[in-house]
A protein has these predicted regions:
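Active-site neighborhoods and metal-handling regions in enzymes and metal-associated proteins
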Residues: 1-412
Length: 412
C-alpha cells in the first residue's frame, strides 16, 4: 500500500498554512478489567497502515516544505508482559513509510510550539460522527479540547478529504478485497457442506467464522447474519439462535476481513438442500435483479440509479407472482438500497458531491425480497469493481444459481 501517496493527496487538499492532527484512538472500557477489541480510526489506518491504539499522525502544511510526523505510544516493559508488545519506532517507520516517528508524550508540546511560534490558519481533525452513534468519538473529543485551548484557530473537518480518496480503490486495495472475498468463498462452501436440518443458526455461523480464521482472516467483517425461516425476513437479524428446519431457507450475510479490508457477501441456501417451487420462483426474481444490476453498473451511474433498476426487476417479478398490483408497492417486500461502497468500512465512506461512480469504486449488489406471509427472505449479494466501461463481479466464483447450489449441497 502506498501510504505516502495518500498522505500527499490529503496534504494537497488541505488549506495552505494548515495542519491536520489525526488520532488512532484509545481502547474502550467495557466492565471491570475488560476492554472492547480495539478498532483504529479508519482514516488513520488508511494514511499510515497502522491499527494500534494511542497513536497520532500530524500533517503539517504550514511548514515549508510540508512535514509528516507520526507519534506512537512508548513501550512499557511491565505492561507488555501482560498485553503484548507495542509497535516499535522501526516497525512504525517500515509500515507507514514515515521517517519522523516520535513518542506520544511529545505531541502536546509539539502542537503548542507549532501554534505559538507559527501562523497556523486552520487545524484539521476527523470530526465525523455516524448518525447512529451516541458514543463520544476520540477524535471529536480531541478537536473540542483543541478548540478550547486555541479559540482563535479555525477547526476544520478532515473526514471529507480522506473520504474522497477512499471512495476509489487502487490496485493494491482491490487485490486485498479480492483476497477477502476468496476467504469468504472457501468458508461459504464449508457452510454449505455442513448445512442440514436440525442444526442451529449459530452452528452455521460458527462454521463460517472458524473457516475464515483458519484461512487467514483477522475477523468477520461484521456480525454474521444467519437467519433461517422467518428470521431471514429481518434485515439485520444476528441473534442466530433458532433451529434450521427442513424446507426452510437460511440467509447468510457475512464476510471476511483481511488486512483491514472487507468482503460483504450474501447467499440464501435451502436448509434441506432443495428449494421448493415457491422459494425458487422468488429466488430467481432476486437473482435476475442481481444480474441486471451487475450488467448496468458503470462509470457515471449512481447507487440510486442502480436501485431504481433493481426495483423495476423486483416489481415485475412480484406482479407476476400476484403479490403486488402496481410497481410502487415493491417497497412492501424490498425496503433497502441495492448498493453501498465497500472497503476499509463495510459500508464504506462516501462524499455526496461525488455520487457518480468512477473506475476503482467497489460497491455491493444486493437485491432482496422479504415475504413474511410465506416465511421467505432471500438476498443475493455480490461485490462489484467499477471498471472503465462497466463492472467486474469480484465474487463471481461464489455460486449463486439454484441449480449450482443444489448440486453442490448434494455433493456433486
Amino acid at each position: 500500500m502506498n501510504y505516502q501517496k495518500r498522505r500527499e493527496q490529503v496534504l494537497d487538499k488541505m488549506e495552505k498554512g494548515s495542519i491536520a492532527i489525526l488520532y488512532s484512538g484509545v481502547e474502550v472500557h467495557v466492565s471491570a478489567d475488560e476492554y472492547a477489541r480495539f478498532e483504529a480510526n479508519r482514516n488513520f489506518f488508511y494514511l499510515t497502515g497502522l491499527r494500534r491504539e494511542e497513536m497520532a499522525l500530524v500533517l503539517d502544511k504550514a511548514a515549508e516544505p510540508a512535514k509528516v510526523t507520526l507519534f506512537i505510544e512508548k513501550a512499557d516493559p511491565d505492561m507488555e508482559r501482560w498485553y503484548g508488545r507495542k509497535v516499535t519506532v522501526e516497525e512504525a517507520k517500515e509500515i507507514s513509510g514515515i521517517t519522523d516517528v516520535q513518542f506520544m508524550e511529545n505531541l502536546p508540546g509539539a502542537i503548542n510550539m507549532k501554534m505559538v511560534r507559527e501562523d497556523v490558519e486552520a487545524v484539521y481533525f476527523d470530526t465525523y460522527r455516524h448518525a447512529m452513534s451516541d458514543l463520544p468519538d476520540y477524535n471529536v473529543v480531541k478537536a473540542g479540547e483543541f478548540a478550547a485551548a486555541y479559540p482563535g484557530v479555525c477547526v476544520k473537518n478532515l473526514f471529507p478529504l480522506a473520504a474522497s480518496l477512499r471512495m476509489w480503490k487502487d490496485a493494491d486495495e482491490v487485490a486485498v478485497v479480492k483476497e477477502a472475498i476468496g476467504v469468504t468463498k472457501t468458508a461459504l462452501e464449508f457452510v454449505m457442506k455442513n448445512l442440514k436440518p436440525g442444526m442451529k443458526e449459530y452452528q452455521a455461523q460458527a462454521d463460517f467464522e472458524y473457516m475464515i480464521r483458519r484461512n487467514g482472516a483477522e475477523w468477520p467483517a461484521f456480525p454474521t447474519i444467519a437467519g433461517s425461516g422467518i428470521n431471514a425476513t429481518m434485515l439485520h437479524y444476528d441473534t442466530n439462535t433458532d433451529t434450521c428446519e427442513d424446507g426452510k431457507l437460511i440467509l447468510l450475510d457475512l464476510g471476511a476481513r483481511v488486512n483491514g479490508y472487507n468482503a460483504d457477501i450474501t447467499r440464501t441456501y435451502p436448509v434441506g438442500g432443495k428449494y421448493t417451487d415457491r422459494q425458487k420462483a422468488v429466488y430467481n426474481i432476486v437473482l435476475a435483479a442481481n444480474r441486471r444490476v451487475a450488467k448496468e453498473a458503470k462509470p457515471g451511474m449512481t447507487c440510486a440509479q442502480l436501485n431504481d433498476i433493481c426495483k423495476e426487476v423486483l416489481a415485475k417479478g412480484l406482479m407476476e407472482l400476484g403479490l403486488i398490483e402496481k410497481k410502487e408497492d415493491v417497497t412492501k417486500y424490498y425496503m433497502h438500497g441495492v448498493s453501498h461502497h465497500l472497503g476499509i468500512d463495510v459500508h464504506d465512506v462516501t462524499v455526496a458531491s461525488q455520487a457518480k461512480l468512477c473506475p476503482g469504486a467497489i460497491i455491493t449488489d444486493e437485491p432482496g425480497l422479504y415475504i413474511d406471509e410465506w416465511e421467505i427472505g432471500i438476498r443475493i449479494e455480490d461485490d462489484l469493481l467499477i471498471t472503465q466501461d462497466g463492472a467486474e463481479v469480484l465474487s463471481e466464483a461464489i455460486i449463486r444459481t439454484p441449480e449450482e447450489i443444489e448440486a453442490f449441497m448434494a455433493g456433486n
